[in-house]
């Protein structure tokens, strides 16, 4: 009988059924004798317990399974952990060593992917990439490999000297996936039907479409809209472009209609060509700014780095000089405290000054863009559309300074910008830049002017205060941005003279913070000023969120405006799962105070059905009530709602989603992100994907995971608790690394058919020998006979399947039988049956 080791944890019938579903295929098919549950319990056959008292029965030698982790050789889908860090998941072939323990085989190419210095190790450098290495320990001294079969985990320990040092979060470009060819469209359709007390009626529909085609690394995109109201309808193309990544440059090449980044000069739209660096192609730990930390360890030491009291980095370093250049900063400011703990326990500390601004780059990193083409005016404007060229660059000079600048030119316009940003240590971070622009208009009038910009940011960890200030100054009324220079009609009184912006946030204690922000603009030609000031407090206590906000606005062509708002949000989990009730009060100058109550929540097991009920009332007794709901299905998101007030009522409706055409057919999906995945479950329908509400394979076995992170490893896992009864999976997790805009394929080899416990007897009616091996003549599937002559079979359907059973090499030590399920739909997840073997 199977022996079970446990920790006193009682199982419900549902949990036991799940254990059978997970463990029997592994225990009885010859792919292994161990399985695991959520509590990491082990289930395995102890050969000592496998003796039988039934006369005439023979047993098969199963002594190899008496050793922990000793399993049948073969190919397994495993998680690979290198030096205690998970690096990948893939299929690895294992062979048995002299002790009958499994040892992994690697190809030279797989070793490269692990970061091993293949070209610097003579025994590997002379081999082809597809050469097989049976014992890595003999080639790289100090290497150890252990296969934890219970968790399908391969633990590798390889000396650091044999490995390249990659930044944290690094994913080898060899894993970046261009995806498979596809045509797709994203659509968002909304409509409303308004009816008024006077008898009037108005209807409106709107359709947004983002269309695309992928072939290899190339991405063709188009964005179009359609609108319709009671009188007119129109179709507009917003933009179209062709794009691909340039991996060697970590950049994107774009041909067509797009917009500049606005990093140096103001952003504008264009039709042309652009080559720009893409920081998404960098590891997470290399994006943005963080200083390089250098020091010296007297022995093998642990280096710990803290910022604002939090540990943001910890690593072991060998004796000698070390360099750390892959930090994840936790904020824009706050000095780094570096602690070196030597092997004898002694500690040394030093402070690395650190503050940052958005444009700052790491030492040695260059961020750039080069654009050329024709200026693209708005659809309804009367602007010029001259040809132009622009180049910008931002370079991290060292731990302290970042230099940046750019050039922009056309027939009647020229601009030059230069600047520097840097850390001031305990004083914060500061940047200063200047842009000069020369503009000539059609009437031959020429202008030139300067724009000065200063930005300052400072964190005060002792008081949890953050301060950010920006100041813009125009030396005269002759400075024009490229957008303004191409406008044929402009108002002198609207020429901006200066602008100041500030933002201050203050954490009082856990969960409560204050903020204040504001801006002021003044203009040439008049003394008027635009002002906007906001202050507020927000927090959370016992799950209840609250905020109080005040805003003051003053504009030259409008009256002053003041507004006060109070918000409360209370969870209702105790009475209504996944729901909240909220209250909002808004008081605005010259308007009646409004009160609003709202209930939001979601239903079904993964929250794919959401709803909201709202009631509002103001001091003039104007009221409005509304009910809205939306449902996220594998084929799109559907929404509908109804509202009514004193003078009108409204119906609204909508659907958003995607249509994907791929080499295997057409699949409907939820709204697609920049990169997405096609799930192929080998024809199995109803297979759900974890962490993606509403996503499940269609009747053809396909589904689309609508959004992925580009150039980073994405984990796609099947929700095994929701698997259909007639579906088994060879693996439940896949890792994909999509390029920008790619549709990558993730295949889950599903075995479709029911699970059956079959009692098999020989021609004389006696149970088959214990340990006999049964194999499916069509699929190659294998199973082992237990002590009662019972076989566990999967993938069984109403179509008869032929099985061969062997318990020796002689002709009289094998037989055959056929088995199928009844034509009627099974009512249990594990069926039972009998068969006679001839």
Label for each model-derived stretch:
Residues 2-4, 8, 17-29, 37-287, ...:
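Post-signal-peptide, soluble extracytosolic/periplasmic N-terminal scaffold domains
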Residues 72-94, 683-693, 764-778:
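Short, ordered, surface-exposed loop/turn motifs in non-cytosolic proteins
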Residues 91-93, 694-702, 779-790:
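Short, acidic Ser/Thr/Gly-rich low-complexity loop/linker segments typical of extracellular
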Residues 98-106, 327-333, 702-724, 728, ...:
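Short Pro-Gly-centered beta-turn/loop motif in secreted/extracellular proteins
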Residues 162, 191-195, 217, 226-230, ...:
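Transmembrane beta-strands of outer-membrane beta-barrel pores
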Residues 176, 203-216, 236-249, 385-399, ...:
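Feature captures outer-membrane beta-barrel proteins of Gram-negative bacteria and organelles
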Residues 185-189, 222, 253-255, 368-372, ...:
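Membrane-embedded beta-strand positions of outer-membrane beta-barrel proteins
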């Amino acid at each position: 009988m199977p022996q079970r080791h446990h920790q006193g944890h009682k199982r419900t019938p549902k949990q036991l059924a799940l254990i059978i579903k997970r463990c029997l295929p592994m225990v009885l098919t010859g792919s292994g004798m161990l399985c695991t549950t959520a509590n990491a319990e082990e289930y395995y056959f102890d050969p000592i317990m496998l003796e039988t008292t039934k006369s005439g029965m023979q047993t098969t030698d199963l002594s190899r399974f008496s050793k922990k982790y000793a399993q049948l050789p073969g190919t397994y889908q495993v998680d690979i952990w290198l030096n205690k860090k998970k690096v990948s998941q893939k299929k690895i072939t294992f062979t048995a060593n002299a002790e009958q323990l499994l040892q992994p085989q690697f190809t030279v190419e797989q070793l490269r992917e692990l970061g091993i210095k293949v070209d610097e190790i003579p025994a590997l450098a002379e081999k082809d990439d597809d050469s097989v290495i049976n014992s890595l320990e003999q080639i790289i001294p100090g290497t150890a490999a252990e296969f934890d079969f219970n968790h399908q985990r391969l633990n590798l320990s390889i000396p650091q000297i044999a490995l390249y040092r990659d930044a944290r979060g690094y994913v080898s470009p060899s894993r970046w996936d261009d995806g498979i060819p596809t045509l797709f469209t994203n659509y968002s359709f909304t409509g409303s039907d308004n009816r008024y007390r006077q008898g009037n009626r108005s209807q409106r529909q709107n359709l947004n479409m983002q269309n695309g085609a992928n072939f290899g690394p190339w991405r063709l995109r188009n964005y179009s809209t359609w609108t319709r109201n009671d009188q007119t309808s129109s179709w507009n193309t917003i933009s179209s472009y062709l794009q691909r990544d340039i991996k060697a440059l970590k950049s994107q090449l774009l041909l067509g209609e797009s917009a500049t980044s606005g990093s140096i000069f103001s952003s504008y739209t264009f039709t042309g060509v652009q080559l720009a660096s893409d920081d998404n192609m960098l590891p997470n730990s290399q994006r943005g700014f963080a200083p390089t930390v250098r020091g010296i360890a007297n022995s093998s030491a642990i280096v710990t780095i803290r910022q604002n009291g939090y540990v943001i980095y910890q690593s072991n370093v060998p004796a000698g000089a070390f360099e750390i250049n892959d930090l994840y900063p936790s904020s824009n400011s706050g000095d780094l405290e570096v602690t070196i703990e030597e092997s004898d326990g002694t500690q040394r500390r030093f402070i690395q000054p650190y503050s940052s601004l958005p444009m700052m780059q790491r030492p040695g990193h260059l961020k750039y863009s080069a654009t050329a083409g024709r200026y693209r005016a708005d659809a309804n404007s009367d602007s010029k559309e001259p040809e132009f060229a622009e180049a910008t660059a931002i370079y991290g000079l060292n731990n302290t300074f970042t230099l940046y600048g750019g050039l922009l030119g056309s027939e009647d316009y020229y601009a030059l910008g230069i600047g520097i940003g840097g850390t001031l240590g305990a004083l914060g971070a500061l940047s200063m830049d200047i842009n000069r622009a020369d503009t000539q208009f059609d009437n031959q009038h020429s202008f030139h002017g300067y724009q000065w910009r200063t930005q300052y940011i400072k964190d005060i960890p002792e008081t949890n205060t953050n301060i950010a200030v920006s100041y813009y100054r125009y030396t005269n009324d002759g400075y024009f941005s490229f957008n303004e220079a191409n406008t044929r009609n402009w108002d002198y009184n609207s020429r901006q003279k200066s602008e100041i912006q500030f933002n201050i946030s203050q954490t009082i204690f856990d969960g409560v913070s204050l903020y204040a922000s504001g801006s002021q603009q003044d203009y040439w030609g008049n003394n008027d000023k635009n002002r906007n000031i906001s202050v507020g407090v927000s927090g959370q206590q016992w799950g209840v969120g609250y905020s109080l906000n005040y805003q003051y606005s003053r504009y030259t062509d409008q009256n002053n405006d003041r507004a006060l708002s109070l918000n409360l949000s209370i969870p209702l989990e105790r009475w209504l799962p996944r729901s909240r009730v909220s209250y909002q009060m808004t008081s605005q100058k010259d308007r009646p105070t409004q009160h609003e109550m709202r209930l939001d929540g979601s239903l079904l097991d993964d929250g794919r059905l959401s709803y909201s009920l709202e009631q509002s009332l103001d001091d003039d007794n104007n009221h409005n009530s509304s009910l809205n709901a939306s449902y996220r299905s594998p084929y799109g998101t559907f929404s509908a709602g109804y509202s009514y007030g004193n003078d009108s009522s409204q119906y609204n409706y909508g659907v958003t989603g995607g249509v994907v055409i791929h080499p295997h057919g057409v699949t409907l999906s939820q709204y697609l992100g920049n990169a997405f995945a096609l799930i192929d479950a080998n024809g199995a329908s109803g297979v759900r994907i974890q962490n993606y509400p509403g996503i499940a394979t269609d009747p053809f076995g396909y589904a689309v995971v609508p959004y992925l992170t580009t150039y980073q490893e994405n984990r796609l896992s099947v929700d095994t608790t929701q698997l259909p009864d007639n579906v088994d999976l060879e693996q439940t997790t896949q890792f994909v690394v999509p390029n920008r805009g790619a549709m990558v394929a993730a295949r889950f080899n599903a075995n479709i058919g029911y699970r059956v416990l079959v009692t098999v007897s020989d021609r004389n009616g006696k149970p088959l020998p214990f340990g006999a091996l049964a194999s499916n003549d069509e699929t190659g599937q294998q199973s082992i006979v237990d002590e009662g002559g019972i076989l566990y079979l999967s993938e069984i359907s109403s179509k008869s399947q032929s099985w061969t059973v062997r318990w020796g090499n002689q002709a009289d030590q094998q037989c055959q039988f056929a088995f199928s399920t009844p034509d009627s739909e099974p009512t249990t997840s594990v069926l039972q049956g009998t068969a006679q073997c001839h």
